[in-house]
Amino acid sequence: GYGFSSNGGHISTPNVDGPATAMRKALQQAGLNAADVQYINAHATSTPVGDANEAQAIHEVFGETKPYVSSTKSMTGHECWMAGASEIIYSTIMMNEGFIAPNINYETPDEHSAKLNIASKTITKDFDVYLSNSFGFGGTNSAVIVKKYK
């Protein structure tokens, strides 16, 4: 499933509604419920406000289902135009190999990320469905859901 939205309110700060809309559209297109997603690869603007807004959007959509959340961007840095594609590759490798990579350098959760199930160390886990976010400058928001082929 794929979801896209645009909120264009600020050049470097996606709001909460735009990212939440993209994730909901991806779930709808995939024919899945929030509880079906077992891992989220987060990717906001790497700014305190942008990351807090992504955390709020994830919590708004996934609530108490508590999928694991991490950001491979924390290990690679910003890969500019390649980021969304490489994060799909990283997430697919994790799904095929049965682990969730940690969100490195994550030490003190803010009020929004504290509500999420953030992986702060490598977790051994088999999972079949993940969502990968790409929220960027100018309010462009995309979410892709991948389900393991069986």
Predicted feature residues:
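Conserved "HGTGT" condensation-loop signature of ketosynthase/thiolase-family condensing enzymes
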Residues: 1-150
